[in-house]
Each structure stands twice: as C-alpha cells, then as structure tokens.
C-alpha cells in the first residue's frame, strides 16, 4: 500500500465521517455513501466499519451498466479508508464485493476500471497493488468477458505480479551504449534502478540529484550501492544520449523490461535490497536515496 498524498487529521476525519461533502461532486452519486456511527472513535475502527458497510446501499441486482464516472467516485471514497483499515477487513470487503458482481460481466468490467483509476493509475491517491490484483484476477477469470477486453489487463497483472514489494526482483536483458549485452540479476548489493528517458526533465533531475550528492556518490564509489539507469523501449540513436552518465553506474536500454516490470511512472525507481527483494518501487529519487542511506548506515 503506497499513499501518494499526505492528509491532515482534519481532512481525514471529513473523508471518513462526511465523505459526500468532502469533495465537490458534479455527478449524481450511485447511492448515499454511508457515514460511520459517532460512537466509533478511532480512525482504524471507522475505516473497518466503512469496509464492512460501504456498498450496503448499492443495488447490485440491476443488470445494466451504471454511470462509470459515478462508480469511479464511489470507488475512490471506498478505497481511501483501506490504508487505515485492518488488512483482514479489507480482504473480506473486497471478497464480498467481487462475489456480488462476478456473475455480471458488465459490472465487473466497470468495477475493474474503477479499481484501476483509484488503486493503480498515476492520478490515484493511493496505490494498493494487492487489492487491485484481486479485481484483475476476477476479471481475467470471467469466461463471459471477451479475450480482446482482457489483453491490457493481462499485461498489467503480469507486470504487477512480477513487481510486488517483498518479492525477488526478476532479471531482464539490456544493451549498453557500446552495444554490449547485459543482464540484470540481484547481486547481493543494495541496488537502485532508475527506469527513465535521457530526454525526460524529471529523469535528468533525478540523475543530477544522485550524481551530485556527495554522500550518495561515496556509497556508489565504495561499492555499497549499485546504480542502474535503464531506458525502456528505446528508439534509434538512444546511445548518443547516454554518454555523460557516471562511469560507475550501469547504463543501457531494454526493449523487454516494460513487459516484465510495473513501470507506471517516468522515471520509475526500483529499490532492491541485498537479499534481492524489491523494497520499494515507483518512488521518488529522494525516497530511494533515503532508503540507501538507511540500509548502508552500518557499513563502513
């Protein structure tokens, strides 16, 4: 679960107690959003209650499609408390919801789109891969949904499944600017991979941030941190744009890595521990460097 925005205590309370009034809604809601009882005090308990009761007022017996924008809004309100609710309550809530919609392929598709918008897309307030995977799994297993509609989601499921925090980072092939074939594999050294484009302003800023930080550069020079810059899906002439990268970085391009890993941002940073497991993904360069400092603090 990765929160992308910091909410104040006041906004949190408003989002949980008065979810309808917390936002300006220009569409008609599908149903009246529930309000947690006043006697429930803690943020966790309020969130648990909403997981249990959020969809109580929705009519799941209708066979036709619903307004997608309205469903997206409802799902966004539903998903925000997931970051404070107990995992067991979230899992139970999602399982119950999927059970209600699994026999209605139209509604299942719409809910999958809503989950994508609120839990996976770049504009989502939070990313919760484990929950989004549950919707993808149900959607892809539904035999009533045409295969052509599943292709994009099949790719997402493969990328996310390969990239879960705590899992071993998968290997991938790349080519260096000099044409030498390379292969990334976890090597027992703390590693930061920036998947980006030399022409991308944010990517250049991240590169500059790492190479000009004296403390971070020292870790790289001493072999305590391994840094890779990989260009996904390269076009002709990419080699000429990667001539000014630090010599102790591994640089290259890969035309297959975007099919293997979840690279929903540009740049996408992956932080990989000494044990080869993904510690964080799609974080900022500052977050990646902060983890590097923490993980190497005991190394001399």
Model region roles, listed by residue range:
Residues 1-5:
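Positively charged n-region of N-terminal signal peptides that target proteins for export
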Residues 8-17:
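Bacterial N-terminal signal peptides
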Residues 22-182:
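Oxidative protein folding and maturation machinery
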Residues 57-81, 188, 235-247, 261-264:
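Structural alpha/beta surface segment adjacent to cysteine/selenocysteine redox centers
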Residues 182-212, 226-228:
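Short active-site neighborhood of thiol/selenol oxidoreductases, capturing the structured segment around
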Residues 221-237, 246-256:
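Thiol-based oxidoreductase modules, predominantly thioredoxin-like and allied folds used
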Residues 242-275:
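Short, internal strand/loop/helix patches
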Residues 265-300:
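Non-catalytic, surface beta->alpha helical segment in thiol-disulfide oxidoreductase systems
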């Amino acid at each position: 679960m990765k929160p992308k925005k910091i909410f104040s205590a006041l906004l949190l309370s408003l989002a949980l107690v008065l979810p309808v009034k917390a936002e300006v809604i220009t569409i008609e809601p599908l149903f009246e959003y529930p309000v947690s009882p006043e006697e429930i005090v803690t943020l966790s308990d309020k969130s648990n209650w909403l997981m249990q009761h959020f969809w109580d007022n929705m009519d799941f017996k209708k066979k036709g499609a619903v307004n997608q924008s309205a469903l997206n809004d409802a799902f966004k309100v539903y998903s925000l408390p997931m970051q404070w609710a107990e995992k067991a309550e979230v899992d139970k809530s999602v399982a119950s919801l999927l059970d209600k919609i699994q026999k209605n392929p139209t509604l299942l598709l719409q809910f999958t789109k809503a989950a994508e918008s609120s839990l996976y897309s770049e504009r989502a307030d939070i990313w919760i891969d484990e929950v989004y995977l549950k919707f993808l799994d149900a959607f892809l297993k539904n035999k009533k949904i045409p295969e052509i509609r599943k292709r994009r989601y099949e790719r997402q499921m493969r990328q996310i499944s390969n990239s879960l925090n705590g899992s071993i980072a998968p290997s991938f092939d790349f080519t260096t600017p000099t044409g030498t074939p390379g292969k990334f594999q976890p090597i027992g050294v703390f590693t930061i991979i920036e998947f980006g484009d030399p022409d991308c302003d944010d990517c250049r800023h991240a590169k500059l941030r790492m190479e000009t930080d004296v403390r971070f550069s020292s870790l790289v020079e001493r072999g305590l941190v391994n840094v890779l810059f990989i260009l996904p899906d390269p076009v002709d002439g990419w080699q000429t744009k990667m001539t000014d990268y630090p010599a102790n970085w591994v640089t290259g391009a890969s035309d297959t890595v975007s099919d293997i890993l979840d690279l929903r941002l540009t740049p996408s940073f992956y932080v990989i521990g000494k044990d080869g497991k993904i510690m964080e993904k799609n974080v900022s360069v500052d977050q990646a460097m902060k983890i590097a400092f923490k993980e190497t603090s005991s190394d001399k």
